[in-house]
């Protein structure tokens, strides 16, 4: 089944589309697409965007940091084990490296995409900080 949120590039733009540009807009577009796919629980699309980032040469540690943040910010207390899982997968990647370690990133993406979502902790901290700044 094709990913629900995967755009189709034109053939003329395929080389540009496949290339990762870490210092420009495409870098942020890809991580944003991965996040949106995770939030939407779209496993296929999330794996697609992960693959695009890996093929494009994105730093796997950057990807892992973003997955860890997602586990805390977007899943949080709905599944507290998501943070532990993201850390374990990041550690596995660091121990094995690419290409075999890419499977750890895929495992993390699948877990996070299928986990229940809650940003209650994020909202609670944001509210507490806002109140603390007023006092």
Segment roles from a protein language model:
Residues 53-135:
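Terminal-proximal interaction/regulatory segments of ATP-powered molecular machines
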Residues 1, 5, 30, 59, ...:
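Conserved acidic
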Residues 12, 45, 104:
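Charged catalytic carboxylate motif
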Residues 11-15, 27, 130-135:
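Non-catalytic accessory segments flanking P-loop/AAA+ NTPase cores
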Residues 19-50:
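Conserved helicase/translocase motor-coupling segment
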Residues 9, 26-30, 45-46, 63-64, ...:
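N-terminal alpha-helical segment
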Residues 1-13, 17:
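Single conserved hydrophobic/aromatic residue that forms the stacking wall/gate
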